Swiss-Prot record:
One of its GO terms (cellular component) is plastid outer membrane. It is a multi-pass membrane protein. Pfam families: Tim17. Induction: Regulated by ABI3 and ABI5. The lineage of its organism: Eukaryota, Viridiplantae, Streptophyta, Embryophyta, Tracheophyta. It is found in: Plastid, Chloroplast outer membrane. Its main location: plastid. The gene is OEP162. GO terms for molecular function: amino acid transmembrane transporter activity; porin activity; protein homodimerization activity. This is Outer envelope pore protein 16-2, chloroplastic. The keyword Membrane applies. Homodimer and oligomers in membrane. Residues 1-102 are annotated as: Contains beta strands.
Length: 178
């Protein structure tokens, strides 16, 4: 690969990071939509790659019981998408449905987090620090806990809020280190 070709590719990647995908007329809406679309794409890739992994593990005859978090029911394989086995249109429908659901969850989390941090920065007079990240992470974590399961307890919501705040704050503090 030539150096000039490498520079062109790197310039394209850098311009993608700075440019917004949408112009909806307000910076808040632009930021939320941009974050939603980018994270939804990541969520879709993650869901498809996870299913591809389980397909390879099952096809190769590996024991997938020892992969990932321990199963509550010992001896049974626990798959995220139990309907995705076999060569049928039902299997493809389940893959598309679950990939869409995962994309929506990732997109909502990113859009919510991005919108809250933008709003907090505006309200606090342009200050963007770990406090904004902690509040946005906590609210996003709590919201995601309430949307991922029908039987979510208040302990799970609080735990997700604390985890979201901790991860977001750590990422904000570490971003200044690197």
């Amino acid at each position: 690969m030539e150096k000039s070709g490498g520079r062109i590719v790197m310039d394209e990647i850098r311009s993608f990071e700075k440019a917004h995908l949408f112009d909806l007329g307000h910076p808040l809406l632009n930021r939320i939509a941009d974050s939603f679309v980018k994270a939804a794409g990541v969520g879709a890739l993650q869901a498809v790659s996870r299913e591809a992994y389980f397909t390879v593990v099952d096809g190769a005859g590996f024991d997938s019981n020892n992969v990932g978090p321990p199963s509550e029911i010992t001896g049974n394989k626990k798959h995220r998408f139990p309907n995705l086995r076999g060569e049928s249109s039902k299997s493809l429908d389940a893959l598309v449905k679950n990939t869409g659901k995962e994309s929506l969850q990732w997109g909502l989390a990113a859009g919510l987090y991005s919108g809250i941090t933008y709003g907090m920065t505006e309200v606090r007079g342009g200050a963007h620090d770990w406090r904004n990240s902690a509040v946005a992470g906590a609210l996003t974590g709590a919201a995601m806990a309430m949307t991922t399961s029908e039987r979510t307890s208040h302990e799970q919501v609080v735990q997700s809020a604390l985890t979201g705040a901790a991860i977001s704050t750590a990422a904000n503090l570490l971003s200044s280190v690197f």
